[in-house]
Each structure stands twice: as structure tokens, then as C-alpha cells.
Amino acid sequence: ANCIVLCNEEGSHRVGARYLTAATGMTMQQVKKNPSRARDLYAPIKDKIKIKDATGRDMSWVESVCKSYKPDVLLLDMGDKFARSQGFARADEALKANAIHARQIAKQHECAVFYMSQLSADAEGKVLLNQSMMEGSRTGKAAEADLMILIAKNPPKQDDGDVEDLQRHLNIVKNKLTGWHGVITCELNYKLGRYES
């Protein structure tokens, strides 16, 4: 599948480094020590994934990118930051319109759209999450999704000190694809940018 990642929160070089480590199974230190091995491992997908900086861009620009590149998969990292608030009385209305535009792009360009978003403060310290815990939205963003995966981590414990708990909980809170809802518990492998069981 041809994929394009439009990132507007972190620099595209940092996002690209995470995709490299996830795809190769090599940490950045290993990549630096053995770049030829990393290049060989990344080669099968190198031409199938494009990562572009999208800072300050809107959904019209996203649509023009889809017309040019014709991706099978489009990742909006972060989807909410493509929204424009002009002409809307409330921020949630702008986010809903943004999600509707993303869905229209998926239909028109026959591609899967992954719309990444933040969780609200309501999700802090909780393992079991629901649709209402997405940042800045009432029901608008959720209504446009076919599948929603919300990622939680364990609440901090007093005696943990500086030890980072890497357990994560993938909450499937909406699923029009198969109908299954539930929680999958896994570990964050931050050195590789992967969620692993």
C-alpha cells in the first residue's frame, strides 16, 4: 500500500526516524552503527511511504496532496491541527467539519484515513476510555469515524519513583468494521516506536 504521512506537530525528520525504527526493528543507536543494514531492512517499504511536513496547512491542502500522490493510506498526524476555526461559533464545530472533510477525502480518493487526535484531561489517569474523552469534541469527530482506538496508560503510582510504566491499553471504543469493542493491553517499546504484546 502507498502511504503518506502528513505531520504538523513534530518535525518530519523525527516522525521519519520513528517509522524507520519501527519498520527495521533497530533502535536509532543501532541504525547509526549499521546504516547499511537499516537501509536494507527499510528498502522494501521506502518507496511506499512518504512523510511530509504539514505545519500550518489545512484540509484543502491535504486534499491536493491526495490528488497528487494518490495514496492508499493517509495519516493525519495530528488531524485536529488541520482544522480552521474561521466561520464557526465553537471549536467543536470546526473539528467536526474537519473530520467530515477527512471522511470525504477518504471516499473521493478511495484511501484509508487515519486521523490522529489527542485525549482530553478527562482521560488522565484512566485505563478505560470512551469517545467523549477526545480533546475538543463533543460527538462530531466520533460520528465521522469507522474505527476509534484510544490509547491509555496506567495511572501513576506513588512508589514508582522515576520508573516509566510502559504498559498501554488500546481501547477499541467504536468499530463499524467488525463490531468488536474492548481493550487490548500491550507494551510500548519506545526505542522502536512500536506497541508490542
Residues of each region from the PLM?
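Structural recognition of the conserved hydrophobic beta-strand(s) that form the central parallel beta-sheet
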Residues: V5, L75-L76, C111-Q118
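C-terminal regions of RecA-like/P-loop NTPase motor modules
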Residues: A43, M59-L74, Q104-H109, A121-S197
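Short, glycine/acidic-enriched loop or turn micro-motifs at the edges of active sites
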Residues: S12, D80, A121
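Helical mechanochemical/support elements of P-loop NTPase systems and associated helical scaffolds
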Residues: G11-V15, R37, D58-W61, A91-H101, ...
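Conserved, well-folded catalytic cores of nucleic-acid-processing
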Residues: A22-M26, M78-S85, I105-Q108, M116, ...
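Cofactor-binding loop segments of dinucleotide-utilizing enzymes, especially the Rossmann-like FAD-
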Residues: N8, Q118, K153
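Cytosolic-facing regulatory segments adjacent to core modules
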Residues: A1-K70, R84, V183-T185
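Phosphate-binding/switch loop-helix module in NTP-utilizing enzymes
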Residues: K50-Q108
